[in-house]
Amino acid sequence: MGETVTIQKNWQELIRPNKLQVTPGSDPARFATIVAEPLERGFGQTLGNALRRILLSSLQGAAVQSVHIDGVLHEFSSIAGVREDVTDIVLNIKDISIKMQGEGPKRMVVKKQGPGVVTAGDIQTVGDVVVLNPDLQICTLDEGAEIRMEFTVATGKGYVPAERNRPEDAPIGLIPVDSLYSPVRKVSYKVENTREGQILDYDKLTMTIETNGAISPDDSVAYAARILQDQLNVFVNFEEPRKEVAQEIIPDLAFNPAFLKKVDELELSVRSANCLKNDNIVYIGDLVQKSEAEMLRTPNFGRKSLNEIKEVLAQMGLHLGMEVPGWPPENIDELAKRFEDHY
């Protein structure tokens, strides 16, 4: 018993963040500042550095792998009536931001006659491929000039140089492109002191994130944290000690004991969890009494978050719009502790 308590103290007595604040930037789909506090001293740097590296290197995204330009044999060519040479065109193509839900590779085509500017918005996409920066300029055509390009798009992670994108059986005229798959463009973080009670030297971690729009900043952090969690599991070489439940008389309840579970224990995205927190929804009993219409009136709460919550509740045999007699009980905190092993 004593050894079990000592083992559990290794993680149970460390302070954990009770605040995770997401502040959207000018474009919420691309920019956000995320603050986590309080953290044990030193954990701000540990977590900030680990999450930053994962965000920039390990999230899945889509990018152009190669391009074929009609009439062009290699990237050191020039095209009649096109102001940019092929090398500059390839550099511009590398900056095309793409969102693709399915597996690749897939093809995209652009065909245009001059005079005028060829932009990423001129690309004819297929299926679930979306160009996220349609205003990006690819090249400029003079009067009478014409260009046709076919792009190969694939999914991956991190950065892949052009040399690795050249297949062994590449046809003449196929030009490989450097692929930046990561949907996260920039990540910076800083660690400051913060206060918790009378202790003044806990850590406050502030992360500033910019994405290409294929993923929201808060979701990118959630995915990075999940990757880190998954990688660390192999280092845990013991089974977590089970709590010894004292024999006690459990009172009868007028409602499902699952309603006493806190919503922050559900596996929800950061955005959904923050919306519930901001609406003072603490327990599942608070949540299930809400209608879909009431939830959608919550600030920053959209259809995606609604579907996520409905799916989680369905897995528990619950749904929105339920009537819960006797809710909330007067001694809800005490009941939640007594029933935590019963839901």
UniProtKB/Swiss-Prot annotation:
Single GO term (MF): DNA binding
Region Alpha N-terminal domain (alpha-NTD), residue ranges: 1-239
SMART domains per UniProt: RPOLD
Keywords: DNA-directed RNA polymerase, Nucleotidyltransferase, Transcription, Transferase
Pfam families in the cross-refs: RNA_pol_A_bac, RNA_pol_A_CTD, RNA_pol_L
Similarity field: Belongs to the RNA polymerase alpha chain family.
Subunit architecture: Homodimer. The RNAP catalytic core consists of 2 alpha, 1 beta, 1 beta' and 1 omega subunit. When a sigma factor is associated with the core the holoenzyme is formed, which can initiate transcription.
Function: DNA-dependent RNA polymerase catalyzes the transcription of DNA into RNA using the four ribonucleoside triphosphates as substrates.
Name of the protein described by the UniProt record: DNA-directed RNA polymerase subunit alpha
Natural source organism: Bradyrhizobium diazoefficiens (strain JCM 10833 / BCRC 13528 / IAM 13628 / NBRC 14792 / USDA 110)
Lineage: Bacteria, Pseudomonadati, Pseudomonadota, Alphaproteobacteria, Hyphomicrobiales
Name of the encoding gene: rpoA
